[in-house]
């Protein structure tokens, strides 16, 4: 009786294991052979370097991936996410610092913002070293290759609470341990157990490589057919006896400036099909690029700069979704990098050892997002403000401005107009005529 109950329980467990279709082991699911439930870092440590190397190759050699990166960077960072403060002294001090904040003296903070985002997308992560020097507070960008992954846990020290306490970096053959408070590890996490980044190309590497291979094969095929325009054929003839000649008795070498390829010596001539291109090539390109764009979380239209397949409403809907991604990226960079740098800079450069005071509130101005239909979009913004669904501050920020600065500038302009005895209408007419 016990044996029967035992077999029954085993059978019930088997039924439970196979209840979900997605968990069944069949020929169709053989590609899931490497699917396993492990700590993220245990899984990623073996593939991270290879993914990074392949992503760098694609970034340098593939125009589609390069265009996607450039599109994201131009929309997220543009000419730089800038600090705005009503305190002129603070504003001027920050502007001066951000022009010379690079420890290596090669880049401004705006340049570094673009490079940080580019590196994070391709490599998966970027390290920012906050260093205090005799020349003031500086920052240095470090690549993932410089992390000594053989020290600590993949280059990190993690305490019992799961907090990173130190990083290990390679320098001149030695390994240097740097306290975590001096390092910003700029990456995006997809799992709770993740501490380091993985290339954002990881979902698209195979698709883009297959696309390149398919395109290259078709181009080579067409080039070969274009170079061999005619063929001479013959039956039951010695293939080494090339005796096909023209009217002067010379062997035929080319026809209409195209080389002739001899299959066998003979007299029958026909043209090869130089237009043998797969009829579904365009569909293949579009579907592949859509898949790549989806893997990069961006619309096909923006990734391929192709709006010919959609109407205005569909294009606008795609742009709105892309803008949400850009908004998220901007918030991520401001929260994890710029606010951290601002706080550290203020404590070191402004306070300079003096008693700490409350950190002055500042605004971060993102690149101007151009309107698709300026008049209609402006009307919508003004109506939202009138209906208390938005504010002038938010409206100004969306145009890369600070509302208070606009008011100050407007006040100065009004005073200038009054000084010269003019009115607003005359100024507008003068600008229109100019």
Model-derived segments and their meaning:
Residues 60-195, 384:
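Structured, mid-chain assembly/scaffold modules that mediate subunit interfaces
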Residues 80, 97, 101, 208, ...:
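Generic structural signal for hydrophobic core residues of well-folded globular domains
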């Amino acid at each position: 009786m016990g044996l029967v109950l035992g077999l029954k329980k085993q059978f019930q467990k088997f039924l439970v294991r196979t209840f979900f279709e997605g968990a069944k082991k069949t020929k169709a699911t053989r590609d899931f052979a490497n699917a396993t439930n492990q700590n993220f870092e245990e899984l990623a440590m073996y593939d991270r370097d290879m993914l990074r190397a392949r992503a760098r190759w694609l970034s340098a050699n593939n125009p589609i991936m390069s265009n996607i990166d450039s599109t994201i960077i131009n929309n997220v960072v543009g000419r730089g996410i800038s600090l705005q403060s009503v305190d002129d002294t603070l504003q001027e001090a920050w502007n001066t610092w951000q022009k010379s904040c690079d420890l290596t003296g090669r880049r401004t903070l705006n340049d570094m913002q673009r490079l940080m985002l580019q590196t994070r997308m391709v490599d998966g992560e970027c390290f920012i070293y906050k260093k205090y020097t005799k020349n003031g507070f500086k920052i240095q960008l470090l690549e993932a290759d410089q992390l000594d992954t053989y020290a600590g846990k993949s280059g990190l020290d993690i305490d019992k609470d799961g907090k990173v306490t130190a990083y290990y970096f390679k320098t001149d053959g030695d390994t240097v341990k740097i306290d975590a408070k001096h390092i910003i590890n700029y990456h995006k996490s997809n799992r709770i157990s993740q501490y380091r980044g993985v290339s954002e190309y990881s979902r698209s590497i195979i698709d883009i490589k297959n696309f390149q291979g398919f395109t290259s094969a078709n181009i080579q095929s067409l080039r070969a057919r274009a170079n061999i325009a005619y063929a001479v054929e013959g039956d039951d003839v010695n293939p080494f006896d090339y005796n096909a000649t023209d009217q002067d008795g010379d062997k035929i070498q080319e026809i209409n400036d195209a080389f002739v390829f001899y299959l066998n010596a003979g007299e029958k001539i026909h043209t090869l099909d130089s237009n043998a291109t797969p009829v579904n090539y365009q569909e293949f390109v579009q579907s592949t690029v859509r898949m790549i764009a989806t893997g990069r979380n961006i619309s096909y239209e923006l990734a391929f700069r192709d709006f010919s397949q959609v109407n205005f409403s569909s294009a606008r809907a795609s742009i709105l979704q892309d803008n949400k991604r850009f908004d998220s990226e901007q918030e991520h960079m401001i929260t994890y990098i710029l606010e951290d740098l601002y706080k550290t800079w203020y404590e070191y450069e402004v306070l300079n050892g003096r008693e700490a005071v409350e950190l002055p509130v500042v605004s971060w101005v993102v690149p101007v997002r151009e309107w698709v239909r300026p008049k209609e979009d402006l009307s919508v913004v003004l109506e939202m403000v009138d209906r208390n669904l938005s504010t002038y501050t938010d409206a100004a920020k969306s145009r890369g401005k600070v509302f208070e600065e606009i008011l100050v500038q407007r006040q100065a302009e009004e005073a200038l107009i009054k000084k010269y005895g003019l009115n607003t209408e005359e100024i507008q007419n003068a600008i229109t005529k100019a």
